[in-house]
């Protein structure tokens, strides 16, 4: 067996998705704790304390206690290499989250036991559906009062349209929480509150009939549990690996991330059943992970991960072959070989140089402006990975400068932040305005904050009469030129040089489409098929 085949089989690359405040970042920490990657978990709640959550590393995130950039963390567990991608928890950062989901092979959905399925969870589930991503579910905050577990399973099935297969089942909830029972092994894991900051294994009974269990949880609770389990095992589906891998069934676990409870059964099950790196579609063929030659795509660019060095790092998912430190790779978009020196692996913002990487791994490439989101690297073959889109923004603002002498820094900052996916940046053909587009209001706050902190630019954003944007394309260059002349006041170029129609109203957009039937108007732009505009 080749090294690439063996190492690919060891990899598990996944993302954690949830509605804000479902406890995703806390669970991330506990997974790292069990993987031995960190010794002590930092409570996300202690926002003003010395210890902040390991995966919330940007200053703004530490101040607000929310994740607004995606972190990448790698740790070993039970002979496997786990690549965990933490996604932005705030609703405004959907696009960044979507691109993270293009780089993983499976996902873990976190649901708050008291709130059930929330709006953000529904949207993220739709994204996972597009690629049939296998999903496991962790119902969190079991140490608090919440919805009836049977009702929760019904809600997940009804709202998200995916079959539930419970793997662990709660014994009580809130103040009455006594533990969980594993429905596949019959093991009972007892809940011991207060042991939440260091790695711990709960007391385990081998079955519901084990001596001493009734004394620990109470005769009545044990009797109620037997009754409930009969009901749930009769009414719910059994775990089916094929259905799970096809994205049609989700194994469900219950626990409390903040108390470190129920996390280890989840991690053990994940390592055993989650898919290793899968094949990937490109514009020309399917790439298998076990191929010997390196391929990979960039799904994220992060500026200024190290404020002392003002650097930019491109996050590349390795799709096939083996990456070795300092190797040259073919950058398909520019048709040039680039030396991938000093590539990094991550523990959030802690970085280490990487000697080699295999399919499923995410590496950081130092980027001086030549690499963009969606770029493909190979060992010479011309191909581009598909399924890495940009979405048309819903909110627009004009950037205004307090100090006109800082225009150059503002343009540089906006260009870099748009390449990173923090915002979209448009330059109208007929004016010198700098227009920003976003999917949520928080993005403008983040951009203003980062412009000031990282580029020394004080900028304000004022409303502008734009309702939506569409990327425009036409096979016939003469027709496209005529369209440009007639609609020049509504046209702009984005940070990649693509032509974009900025519509003041939906009616205006509809009229423009009716008047130019040969022009294609796109609400998303696929990076693999990006078309340059002069």
Curated annotation (Swiss-Prot):
Pfam families, per the entry: EF-G_D2 (PF22042), GTP_EFTU (PF00009), RF3_C (PF16658)
Keywords: Cytoplasm, GTP-binding, Nucleotide-binding, Protein biosynthesis
Cellular component, GO, one term: cytosol
InterPro entries: EF-G-like_DII, EFG_III/V, G_TR_CS, P-loop_NTPase, PrfC, RF3_C, RF3_dom_3_sf, RF3_GTP-bd
Compartment(s) where it occurs, according to its Swiss-Prot or TrEMBL record: Cytoplasm
Main localization, broad class: cytoplasm
Family listed: Belongs to the TRAFAC class translation factor GTPase superfamily. Classic translation factor GTPase family. PrfC subfamily.
Protein's UniProt name: Peptide chain release factor 3
Source species of the chain: Xylella fastidiosa (strain M12)
């Amino acid at each position: 067996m080749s090294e690439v085949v063996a190492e690919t089989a060891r990899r598990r690359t996944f993302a954690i998705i949830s509605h804000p405040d479902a406890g995703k970042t806390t669970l991330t920490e506990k997974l790292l704790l069990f993987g031995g990657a960190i010794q002590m978990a930092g409570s996300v709640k202690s926002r003003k304390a010395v210890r902040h959550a390991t995966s919330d590393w940007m200053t703004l995130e530490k101040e607000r206690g929310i994740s607004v950039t995606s972190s990448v963390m790698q740790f070993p567990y039970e002979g496997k290499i786990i690549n965990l991608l933490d996604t932005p928890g705030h609703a405004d950062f959907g696009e960044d989250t979507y691109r993270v989901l293009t780089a993983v092979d499976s996902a873990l959905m976190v649901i708050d036991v008291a709130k059930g399925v929330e709006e953000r969870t529904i949207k993220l589930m739709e994204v996972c559906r597009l690629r049939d991503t296998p999903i496991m579910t962790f119902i969190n905050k079991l140490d608090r009062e919440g919805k009836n577990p049977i009702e929760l399973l019904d809600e997940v099935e009804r709202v998200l349209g995916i079959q539930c297969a419970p793997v662990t089942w709660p014994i009580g909830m809130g103040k009455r929480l006594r533990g969980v029972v594993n429905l596949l092994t019959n093991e009972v894991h007892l809940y011991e509150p207060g042991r939440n900051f260091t790695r711990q294994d709960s007391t385990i009974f081998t079955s519901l009939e084990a001596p001493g269990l009734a004394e620990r949880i109470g005769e009545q609770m044990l009797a109620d549990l037997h009754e409930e389990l009969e009901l749930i095992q009769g009414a719910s589906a059994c775990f089916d690996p094929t259905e799970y891998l096809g994205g049609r069934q989700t194994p469900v676990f219950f626990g409390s991330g903040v108390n470190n409870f129920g996390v280890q059964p989840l991690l053990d099950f994940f390592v055993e059943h989650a898919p290793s790196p899968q094949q990937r579609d490109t514009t020309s063929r399917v790439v298998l992970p076990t191929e010997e030659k390196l391929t990979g795509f960039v799904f994220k660019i992060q500026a200024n991960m190290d404020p002392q060095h003002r650097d930019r790092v491109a996050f590349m998912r390795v799709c096939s072959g083996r990456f070795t430190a300092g190797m040259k790779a073919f950058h398909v978009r520019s048709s040039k070989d680039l030396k991938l020196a000093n590539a990094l692996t991550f523990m959030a913002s802690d970085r280490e140089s990487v000697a080699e990487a295999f399919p499923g791994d995410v590496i950081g490439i130092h980027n001086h402006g030549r690499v963009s989101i969606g770029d493909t690297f190979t060992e010479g073959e011309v191909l581009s990975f598909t399924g890495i889109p940009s979405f048309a923004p819903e909110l627009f603002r004009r950037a205004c400068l307090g100090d006109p002498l800082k225009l150059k820094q503002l343009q540089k900052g906006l260009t870099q932040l748009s390449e990173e996916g923090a915002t979209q940046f448009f330059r109208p053909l007929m004016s010198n305005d700098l227009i920003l587009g976003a999917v949520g209001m928080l993005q403008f706050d983040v951009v203003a904050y980062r412009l000031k902190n990282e580029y020394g630019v004080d900028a304000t954003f004022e409303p502008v009469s734009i309702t939506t944007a569409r990327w425009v394309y036409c096979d016939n260059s003469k027709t496209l030129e005529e369209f440009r002349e007639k609609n020049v006041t509504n046209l702009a170029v984005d940070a990649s040089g693509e032509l974009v129609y900025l519509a003041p109203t939906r009616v205006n957009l509809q009229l423009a489409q009716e008047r130019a039937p040969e022009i294609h108007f796109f609400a998303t732009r696929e990076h693999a098929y990006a078309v340059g505009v002069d």
